[in-house]
Amino acid sequence: MKVVTFGEIMLRLKTPENLRIMQSDGFEASYGGAEANVAVSLAMYEDKCAFVSKVPNNPVGMSALSEVRHYGVNTDYLVRGGDRLGIYFFEKGSDIRNTNVVYDRAFSAFSLSQPSEYHWENILEPGDVFYFSGVTPAVSKYVEDTVRSALKY
């Protein structure tokens, strides 16, 4: 049995300290996304897991892929294509100001995923756990259709 997670990995740009985006002249870059984070957490406990997504076939997409692989997550079923990785900007709250997150994921490689790009019959085996967050099918109609196709297996 393995856990298969399906979702978008994004470039996370965080303002330094507690600065707002408008106050910052730079960002700290990392990668994140609910399903990627779950896969990494499971891999750290040496559980068998795979992360399924779509990233652009460029240095940013390959860097995101490398980050997940670094923790021992299987990325064999990851699709490469599209033009851009989704981005989110993170402002840490302080005192009375709440944390703020701004998403820029329209037309990301993942949001344009097509069901035909994923061969679920080869990815999911009987007894596997399939994990996706509630946001995933809401990313786009294409992704919703892709989730529906996976659920048939």
Locations of the language-model features?
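Glycine-rich beta-alpha junction loops
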Residues: 9, 82, 107
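A common structural microfeature
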Residues: 48-49, 84-87, 100
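C-terminal domain-closing interface element
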Residues: 88-98
